[in-house]
């Protein structure tokens, strides 16, 4: 009897283990998707509600949509109609809202200036202007804009864009800012005298921003302690202002997402991941490897090296999967949900993506067990093939 029982018991145990393994595999988390709908800036929407709904309906047949980020036209009726459709399908709708830039059409905000009190080159040349990140009136103006123009449109949350200073798109003046009197006081409270920073730059030039060490995950270490202190303080100052706005939106019962630069470039624009991820429901780091325009990782890094050619220690960086994984590793410990932004739009000269590139990026993200992807940056114009590959 014992001899008969042992093989039966062994077989039964194996069946249980096999079923357990099979069940575990079937329960592997599937990626969730956030899509963005760009309908124009403050003017009449570039798409009708019916066009947007039809597009979202077709996309939802290819992939599961969890959230839709839409903005930032002032047409309330579009949001109400789209929101009604989304809520019928248990999809959250978030307002796409810029914080520190592109608000001059609707708000009287004070501008950001470099450490010499000058408007950075990007705005002087006709680009959009960035605003001071510490002026309390600037912050309250954006909250007031939401309350006046969007609070009755059915939004479940707000996705804050432009939560940074200028980048090297504006040259060195884009990152050595803001130097207004208010920001000067904030830097002083962080132990940084901006007069000393100005003097160091004027004396050392590009070498002031040299780095002594680079690690793909932990980022750059500045050779000059004053440069390190400046960017540490800048990250605290800008990110704490963003946190204050996020907290105010949370008090209104809203979910909050943040649009972030890739971790290796974030310190230059004042984004401290540790602070920001504690005040957001989710972050969308822009891990754009194929974008040859602002926010593209390679594009921004090339601008850095061109802006400070005399700085030492900046290595060649290949925008391959290994580098993508280093950026995913850098944000792995952030306590909020993580939806890396992967570009799915296509334009031969600016964003030459492919279905293979999109699928490759998804695979890397899911190896880190992140929540999913933010499909950037306008689902209305993305090729279907770049979406369908995600559902396979």
Kindly give the residue locations of the regions a language model identified.
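An active-site-proximal structural segment forming one wall of the substrate-binding cleft
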Residues: 130-169, 173, 248, 273-276, ...
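Aromatic- and acidic-residue-enriched carbohydrate-binding clefts of CAZyme catalytic domains
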Residues: 103-133, 171-228
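Active-site-adjacent "subsite" loops/lids of carbohydrate-active enzymes
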Residues: 83, 94-153, 170, 239, ...
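Catalytic domains of carbohydrate-active enzymes, especially glycoside hydrolases
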Residues: 45-78, 152-157, 282-286, 364-374
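Boundary/entry segment of secreted carbohydrate-active catalytic domains
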Residues: 26-55, 343-345
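Short, acidic/polar
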Residues: 43-61, 137-149, 265-276, 351-366
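The substrate-binding groove and active-site-proximal loops of carbohydrate-active enzymes
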Residues: 41-45, 65-73, 124-143, 224-239, ...
């Amino acid at each position: 009897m014992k001899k008969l029982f042992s093989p039966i018991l062994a077989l039964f145990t194996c069946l249980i283990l096999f079923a357990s393994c099979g069940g575990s595999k079937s329960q592997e988390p599937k990626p969730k998707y956030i899509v963005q709908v760009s309908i124009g800036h403050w003017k009449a929407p570039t798409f009708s509600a019916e066009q947007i709904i039809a597009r979202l309906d077709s996309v939802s047949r290819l992939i599961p949509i969890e959230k839709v980020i839409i903005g930032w036209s002032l047409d309330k009726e579009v949001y109400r109609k789209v929101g009604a459709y989304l809520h019928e399908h248990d999809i959250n709708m978030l307002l796409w809202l810029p914080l520190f830039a592109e608000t001059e059409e609707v708000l009287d905000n004070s501008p950001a200036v470099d450490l010499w009190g000058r408007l950075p080159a990007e705005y002087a040349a006709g680009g959009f202007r960035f605003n001071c990140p510490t002026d309390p009136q600037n912050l309250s103006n954006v909250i007031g804009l939401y309350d006046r123009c969007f609070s009755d449109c059915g939004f479940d949350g707000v996705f804050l864009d432009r939560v940074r200073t200028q980048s090297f798109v504006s040259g060195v003046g884009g990152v050595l800012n803001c130097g207004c009197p208010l920001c000067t006081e904030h830097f002083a409270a962080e132990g940084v005298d901006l007069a000393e920073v100005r003097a160091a730059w004027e004396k050392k030039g590009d070498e002031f921003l040299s780095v002594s060490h680079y690690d793909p995950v932990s980022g750059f270490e500045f050779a000059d302690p004053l440069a390190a202190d400046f960017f540490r303080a800048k990250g605290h100052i800008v990110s704490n202002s963003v946190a204050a706005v996020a907290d105010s939106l949370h008090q209104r019962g809203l979910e909050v997402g943040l649009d972030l630069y890739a971790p290796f470039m974030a310190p230059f624009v004042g984004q401290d991941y540790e602070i920001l991820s504690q005040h957001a429901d989710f972050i969308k780091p822009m891990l754009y490897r194929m974008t040859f325009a602002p926010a593209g990782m390679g594009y921004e890094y090339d601008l850095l090296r061109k802006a400070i050619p005399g700085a030492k220690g900046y290595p060649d960086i290949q925008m391959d999967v290994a580098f993508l994984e280093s950026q995913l590793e850098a944000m792995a410990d952030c306590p909020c949900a993580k939806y890396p932004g992967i570009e799915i739009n296509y334009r031969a000269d600016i964003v030459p993506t492919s279905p293979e590139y999109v699928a490759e990026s998804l695979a890397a993200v899911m190896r880190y067990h992140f929540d999913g992807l933010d499909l950037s940056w306008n689902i209305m114009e993305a090729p279907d093939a770049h979406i369908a590959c995600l559902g396979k």
